[in-house]
């Protein structure tokens, strides 16, 4: 399992990014308006304070979920765990979440994770590189899906144990 730790960590970021995007894009403000942070109960405000400390703001989905402090706390706990530095850095995870959001056409997620990448020092060149790689892989995936291709790289592309970009410098 240790050899796959990076993949599990990345998969967690992908899943949690999707979950947050579903709330944000599926419950827009005209359907279920976000609360003002000051209108939330004490339990929800404590969570929202932690969200603000992490993001520098409180993204709308967290304010929407403030109506249900338990749900808010559960989702925030999952987001926080997924995006903390572990084997992969938060900066790399924000780039991955940006790519996931861009590919799934989540306006909320694309804006949130682009803003976080910028906060964490990713410049215009880095943003364009991530966008280009995302576009390329998304295009190839659509072509492969359309042609119903099966993966055939198992015997010629062995597992690479080296750390992913943003991972620990000395290897795992």
Question: Where is each model-derived feature located?
Answer:
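Hydrophobic alpha-helical segments
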Residues: 1-172
């Amino acid at each position: 399992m240790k050899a796959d730790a990076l993949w599990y960590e990345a998969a967690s970021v992908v899943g949690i990014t999707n979950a947050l995007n579903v709330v944000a894009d599926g419950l827009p403000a005209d359907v279920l308006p976000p609360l003002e942070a000051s209108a939330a109960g004490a339990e929800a405000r404590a969570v929202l304070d932690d969200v603000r400390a992490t993001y520098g703001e409180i993204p709308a989905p967290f304010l929407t979920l403030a109506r249900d402090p338990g749900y808010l706390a559960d989702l925030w706990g999952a987001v926080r765990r997924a995006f903390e530095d572990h084997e992969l850095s938060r900066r790399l995870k924000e780039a991955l979440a940006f790519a996931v959001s861009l590919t799934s056409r989540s306006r909320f997620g694309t804006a949130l994770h682009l803003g976080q990448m910028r906060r964490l020092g990713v410049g215009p060149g880095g943003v364009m590189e991530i966008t280009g790689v995302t576009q390329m892989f998304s295009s190839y995936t659509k072509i492969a899906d359309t042609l119903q291709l099966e993966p055939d790289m198992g015997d010629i592309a062995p597992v690479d144990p080296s750390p992913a970009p943003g991972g620990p410098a000395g290897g795992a």
